[in-house]
Amino acid sequence: MATKKKTNFDDITKKYGAERDKALADALALIEKDFGKGSLMRLGEAANQKVSVVSSGSLALDIALGAGGYPKGRIVEIYGPESSGKTTVALHAVAAVQKEGGIAAFIDAENALDPEYAKALGVNIDELLLSQPDYGEQGLQIAEKLITSGAVDLVVIDSVAALVPKAEIDGEIGDSSVGLQARMMSQAMRKLAGHINKTKTTAIFINQLREKVGVMFGSPETTPGGRALKFYASVRLDVRGSTKIEEGSGDNKTQIGKITKIKVVKNKVAPPFKVALVDIMFGEGISRTGELLNIAVDEGIIKKSGAWFAYNDEKIGQGAEKAKNYLKEHQEIFDEIDHKVRTAHGLLDEAEVAETTEDTSTKAKATKAKKEEKVVETEEIELELED
């Protein structure tokens, strides 16, 4: 009986491998010629590149986002109930971008932006690009033009629910306009997603909440504008105010802010479902000292015993508000704790780490020199006593 000849795949690979490699190289060259460099690449060439981010303006939120901030070239959705702090969270991102020398635009579809409050949050209102569109399509077209220019680092749309289609505005109150906004948003997402990625612009869409009628099981809450934004968004944040922050006692007790929970319900660049707790103070926004105090206590950098807070075995205040005031008044201590927290969570870039290492080394040398001087002085005193 004749034996079946075994196929040797190594021989086939050797014979046709060179021809296949040449054919692939020709195809890659043709694609790059027709569609531009970078239109097709091997995944390994870009696998080690870290996702570029822009700070959210909140240390706690940067940590919860995992990557250190909002990813560049991606879409972010911030939603929550009324007066939960959605616009405040977005304005802190605007201030952070401007602080780094970037350009930010704010499309105020709700016509509700308060310039004085934005200024209090650190926004440079003289440099902020502001648009208050008459209808939804106009607002999205303005956003598209800003994004495709490649000159803007951050675009905030406040809010999706206020992006009313022109057909609905031109019609009468009570006219049926089922699906108009969803279709408008779906088309906008298809057009904007590619431009946002190419220009590395971060687009933040603020959204409201609605309730679905007749839901018996699960959450009845939903966001307006259809499902397109949910799919295209790389990050989705659920913002909800929880506990009041009050000062005074008895009848003199007044609310000065609220503890707000920001949950990362979707994240394509880091593990999701992390939570950031921030203190949003009236007229101030997210309290930098408040969030730093909370994180430092969780990390064990600041010790808490009862109502007392201590750093390096030194008491800094009885009660959170007094500890926050201490950090406000002592900028060096604030910066030192802030640096320790950022180092622990890998939020410092290589240059900052190198600079810190150099500073630490210099301080260590200075401390050692001082100790040696003290030793020499002690020896001289002992010799004088012996004489």
Curated annotation (Swiss-Prot):
GO BP, sorted A to Z: DNA recombination; DNA repair; SOS response
**Gene Ontology CC annotation, any one:** cytosol
Q: Which Pfam family name is an example for this entry?
A: RecA_C
Is-annotated flag, keyword Metal-binding?
no
Q: What is its main location?
A: cytoplasm
Keywords annotated in UniProt: ATP-binding, Cytoplasm, DNA damage, DNA recombination, DNA repair, DNA-binding, Nucleotide-binding, SOS response
- InterPro entries to which the protein is assigned, alphabetical: AAA+_ATPase, DNA_recomb/repair_RecA, DNA_recomb/repair_RecA_CS, P-loop_NTPase, RecA-like_C, RecA-like_N, RecA_ATP-bd, RecA_C_sf
List ligand-binding residues for ATP. G80, P81, E82, S83, S84, G85, K86, T87
Q: Which domain of life is it from?
A: Bacteria
Instruction: List the biased-composition ranges (Acidic residues).
Output: 378-387
Where do the record's region annotations for Disordered lie? 352-387
Where, subcellularly, is it found?
A: Cytoplasm
One MF term from GO for this chain?
Answer: single-stranded DNA binding
What the record says about family reads: Belongs to the RecA family.
- Cross-referenced PANTHER family: MITOCHONDRIAL DNA REPAIR PROTEIN RECA HOMOLOG-RELATED (PTHR45900:SF1), RECA (PTHR45900)
Describe the function of this protein: Can catalyze the hydrolysis of ATP in the presence of single-stranded DNA, the ATP-dependent uptake of single-stranded DNA by duplex DNA, and the ATP-dependent hybridization of homologous single-stranded DNAs. It interacts with LexA causing its activation and leading to its autocatalytic cleavage.
Q: Which protein are we looking at? A: Protein RecA, chromosomal
Species per Swiss-Prot/TrEMBL record: Lactococcus lactis subsp. lactis (strain IL1403) (Streptococcus lactis)
Lineage of the source organism? Answer: Bacteria, Bacillati, Bacillota, Bacilli, Lactobacillales
Name the encoding gene, please. Answer: recA
